């Protein structure tokens, strides 16, 4: 595995972690909070984004405008049943969700959740490193690399990992700062 391939794989892993971070509430309303909500619509689980337009008219409100008004009740039910703890307000045409300010206790819970997502991201990055190093060792064993070349490749793989871990730590720090900001 070349360093560029490894970096591309690690970049994808980092982006997945960032998407997880985006689903964690901060003090502001954000339509990405609803990314993981699936609505049972005509017997099939459908992502909310496929059924409605999501917008944030102000910092404390998320507005959901369904493409098909008949799905309004199903969307409302899915949001109410989600783990987000939001109470949707249905006016017959749109659903509005008031995002209340976070309590200190809730902020700490979300920081723990962000740390958990970051740790999962680190594990994914380490797994990619392990796979890359295993390939290098196999190439050394097959005679494609000398021992010195193998060690150099392993060092470069480790440097790539270190770079991405630092980036992930920065993302975590930014997310925690956003969560704790009152």
Curated annotation (Swiss-Prot):
Matches recorded under Gene3D superfamilies: 3.30.1360.40, Ribosome-recycling factor (1.10.132.20)
Signal peptide: none
Region annotation (Disordered) ranges: 136-156
GO molecular function (one): ribosomal large subunit binding
Function comment: Responsible for the release of ribosomes from messenger RNA at the termination of protein biosynthesis. May increase the efficiency of translation by recycling ribosomes from one round of translation to another.
Coiled coil stretches, renumbered: none
NCBIfam families, per the entry: frr
Organism: Synechococcus sp. (strain CC9902)
Record-level GO cellular component terms: cytoplasm
UniProt-recorded name of the protein: Ribosome-recycling factor
Location within or outside the cell: Cytoplasm
Lineage, highest ranks first: Bacteria, Bacillati, Cyanobacteriota, Cyanophyceae, Synechococcales
Keywords: Cytoplasm, Protein biosynthesis
PANTHER family associated with the record: MITOCHONDRIAL RIBOSOME RECYCLING FACTOR PSEUDO 1 (PTHR20982:SF3), RIBOSOME RECYCLING FACTOR (PTHR20982)
Principal subcellular localisation of the protein: cytoplasm
HAMAP family: RRF (MF_00040)
């Amino acid at each position: 595995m070349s360093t560029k391939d490894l970096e591309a794989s690690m970049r994808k892993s980092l982006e997945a972690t960032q998407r997880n971070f985006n689903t964690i509430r901060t003090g502001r309303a954000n339509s990405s909070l609803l990314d993981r909500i699936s609505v049972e619509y005509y017997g099939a689980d459908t992502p909310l984004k496929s059924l409605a337009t999501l917008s944030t008219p102000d910092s404390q409100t998320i507005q959901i405008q369904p493409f098909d008004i008949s799905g309004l009740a199903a969307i409302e039910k899915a949001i109410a049943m989600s783990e987000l703890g939001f109470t949707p307000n249905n006016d017959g045409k749109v659903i509005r969700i008031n995002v209340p300010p976070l309590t200190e206790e809730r902020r700490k819970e979300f920081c723990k959740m962000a740390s958990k997502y970051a740790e999962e991201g680190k594990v994914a990055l380490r797994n990619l490193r392990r796979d890359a190093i295993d390939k290098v060792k196999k190439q050394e064993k097959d005679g494609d690399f000398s021992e010195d070349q193998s060690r150099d490749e392993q060092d470069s793989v480790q440097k790539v990992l270190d770079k991405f871990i630092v980036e992930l730590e920065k993302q975590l720090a930014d997310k925690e700062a956003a969560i704790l900001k009152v």
